[in-house]
Amino acid sequence: MSTKKKSIIKCIDWRSIEEPDLPLEVAGWLMEAGSMTERFERHCHKIIIDLKHEGFIEHQALSDEKELLPESPRYWIREVVMCADDEPWLLGRTVIPQDTLSGPEHALLNLGKTPLGRYLFSSKDLKRDYIQTGRQGDLWARRSLLQLSNKPLLLTEVFLPASPLYCHSRNTKLA
């Protein structure tokens, strides 16, 4: 089934991968190589995923994302808001070519309210090709091309105002 829903992630001004020119206070967050879910969990008591949309879309319905992924007749889209202690911290959008969803990766269709990072970083076969940073107005964003068992998926994350990325003095979880 195809869908025409609008993305929760609006236009992002992407920076060069080679020279992201990031302020030091946000570089550590945006260039995080590990799980953002795990990183966020060090700054809150509870992470909840608010699933906004998931489903297949046709190739022509993708925006600039189609240039970053292999051509596929359909792509699985998953859009979420990651909330920490009941505050929205991150918008996430995952784009997965249909061929990536074969074998064990078929489980990506059934994550529901499970954070994507919990699934991805439990795999021994996960590799990140790159991280690209950008801005959506005053908000910082990043996108990563990941390879799960040598099969690609694109993850875009927009850090919302309550995110610890913007709270430079908040370093650890509150007691």
Curated annotation (Swiss-Prot):
Keyword Membrane: no
A Gene Ontology term for the protein's cellular component: cytosol
Residue positions binding substrate: 36, 78, 116, 157
GO biological process: pyruvate biosynthetic process; ubiquinone biosynthetic process
Cellular location(s): Cytoplasm
Catalysed reactions, as listed in the record: chorismate = 4-hydroxybenzoate + pyruvate
Signal peptide: none
EC class of the enzyme, as a word: lyase
Keywords: Cytoplasm, Lyase, Pyruvate, Ubiquinone biosynthesis
Primary location recorded for the protein, binned into one broad class: cytoplasm
Catalytic activity, EC: 4.1.3.40
Example of a GO MF term: chorismate lyase activity
Domain of life: Bacteria
Coiled coil (residue ranges): none
Protein's pathway: Cofactor biosynthesis; ubiquinone biosynthesis
UniProt-listed Pfam families: Chor_lyase
Keyword Lyase: yes
The family this protein is said to belong to: Belongs to the UbiC family.
Subunit structure comment from the entry: Monomer.
NCBIfam families assigned: PRK11655.1
Biological function: Removes the pyruvyl group from chorismate, with concomitant aromatization of the ring, to provide 4-hydroxybenzoate (4HB) for the ubiquinone pathway.
Name by which UniProt lists this protein: Chorismate pyruvate-lyase
Annotated source species: Hamiltonella defensa subsp. Acyrthosiphon pisum (strain 5AT)
Lineage, top ranks: Bacteria, Pseudomonadati, Pseudomonadota, Gammaproteobacteria, Enterobacterales
